[in-house]
Amino acid sequence: SITSEFIPWNNNSHKKIIKALLVNTKNANTFTGKQGKESIDTIAKNLSRELTLKESKNQKGTKETVKIKDLIFASTGVIGEEFPMEKIKNSLPDLVVKLRSDQNKMYWIKIASAIMTTDTKPKLAYEEIIIGDELVRICGIAKGSGMIAPNLATMLSFIFTNADINSNLLKTLLKRAASNSFNAITVDSDQSTNDMVTIFSTRALKVGQNLSLNDKIIQKFELALKKLCLNLAKQVVVDGEGAKKFLT
């Protein structure tokens, strides 16, 4: 099947720990051939260097090396145009400098707005649950509008949680949540080349790495994740390109 150049990059990573996600809009990096593939390689090397340099100046904690295989990418935009590698590469130093660890609602709105293409509004969702005495947070953003069909299509969604859940289990939970949300919507029945939905854990809150689908903690988390994904999927449909009706 035909995909954007970032899809095989992400699939070949096989990393359970990802340290950075870079998203670009306006260019899908699809049907770009050798130039598109080499662009990702170049951007990855430069982003790796900039993030490692930032870590070397970190006064608050462990200084880590960020390798190119610690990175994943997403693209959305026009298909078949030359990928603007130089423009993106030259913007990386300033982009990395602006990275921050503290967050608020406006910060998330800015991120959701930055990935918009034909969307008319940013799409965000938030869920929280209590596990023991701890607050588990799940936050997600998405973009969509045109060409949304089952099995995703031109839709990107990035979900984040502080719960330190085993990566394989987290992947299973996301697949189950997506099956009745992102993979069950359509706007104009066309499928795209840049599908992506992913979930990240900051691992800040230890809930247990040896949990399974049968554990009540995981079942509680899964319900919240499914609710969040359905919320985002509905936002994508409601804001569909030219959409005037929402059928369920």
Regions found by a protein language model. Give the residues of each.
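Glycine-rich phosphate/pyrophosphate-binding loop regions near the starts of catalytic domains
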Residues: 1-45, 72, 147-170
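Short, well-ordered amphipathic alpha-helical segments that serve as non-catalytic structural scaffolds
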Residues: 2-12, 39-52, 171-184, 223-233
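Short glycine/threonine-rich loop-to-helix capping motif typified by GTGT followed
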Residues: 34-36, 80-88, 201-213
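Glycine-rich, mobile lid/loop segments that gate access to catalytic sites or pores
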Residues: 49-52, 66-182
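Short beta-strand-to-turn element immediately C-terminal to the catalytic PLP-Schiff-base lysine
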Residues: 158-161, 198-202
